[in-house]
């Protein structure tokens, strides 16, 4: 029995040797050449895979950029006609002496009648006659954005609005004086707090529009 096992083992070894010799002879490929071919093939495959991944990443970046570029302005993103309309005459104001008589350093500089600080943002602070638009009223003002009534003014009576801008230059370049229809999104209760204004400006569903209005300070 031992002799039979040795005989089978020898036959197997001879078969494998003959097969390997035949393969190398027919193909003309030496073992070292075969190893080199396998390595080169793997490197080529990995290179192609890397190029495909890079192309996919570039395509994804281009798609994201295109989506951002296609973001509609706030005016076109919603059906504002669903809300009550009010005809107003709107002007612009700043926190400075030219509008409020106050200068930086004054404890009341930049503070509105409601106590919140003036802000140009997704929801900006605006001044109105509280008998027409109570403090806290949210308005959509075409070409200006969303405004929250947080301030009043001695000259702001009736259907008048004063829209906050950072500088006098912004007032003249971006607004001036306009008569237009505004949309009453929500009637105010007579008050507004910093926390409430901040929450409005952090509304997740509207962040895509925020950079259209937010003033970026260095």
Curated annotation (Swiss-Prot):
Keywords recorded for this protein, A-Z: Signal
Signal peptide: 1-31
GO BP field: peptidoglycan turnover
Keyword Cell inner membrane: no
Transmembrane portions of the chain: none
GO cellular component: outer membrane
Any one Pfam family match given in the protein's UniProt record, by short name: 3D
Keyword Signal: yes
Single GO molecular function: hydrolase activity, hydrolyzing O-glycosyl compounds
Full protein name: Uncharacterized protein YuiC
Species for this entry: Bacillus subtilis (strain 168)
Gene name per UniProt: yuiC
């Amino acid at each position: 029995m031992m002799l039979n096992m040795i005989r089978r083992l020898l036959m197997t070894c001879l078969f494998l040797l003959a097969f390997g010799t035949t393969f190398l002879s027919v193909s003309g490929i030496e073992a070292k050449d075969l190893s080199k071919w396998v390595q080169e093939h793997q490197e080529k495959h990995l290179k192609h895979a890397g190029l495909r991944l890079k192309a996919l990443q570039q395509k994804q970046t281009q798609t994201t950029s295109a989506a951002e570029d296609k973001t509609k302005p706030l005016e076109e993103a919603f059906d504002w006609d669903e809300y009550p309309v009010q005809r107003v005459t709107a002007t612009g104001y700043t926190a400075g002496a030219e509008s409020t008589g106050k200068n930086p350093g004054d404890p009341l500089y930049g503070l509105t009648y409601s106590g919140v600080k003036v802000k140009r943002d997704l929801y900006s602070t605006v001044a109105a006659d509280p008998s027409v638009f109570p403090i806290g009223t949210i308005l959509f003002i075409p070409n200006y954005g969303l405004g929250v009534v947080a301030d009043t003014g001695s000259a702001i009576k009736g259907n008048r609005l004063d829209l906050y801008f950072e500088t006098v230059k912004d007032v003249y370049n971006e607004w001036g004086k306009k008569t237009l229809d505004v949309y009453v999104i929500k009637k105010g209760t007579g008050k507004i707090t910093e926390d409430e204004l901040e929450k409005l400006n952090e509304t997740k569903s509207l962040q895509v529009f925020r950079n259209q209005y937010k003033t970026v300070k260095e």
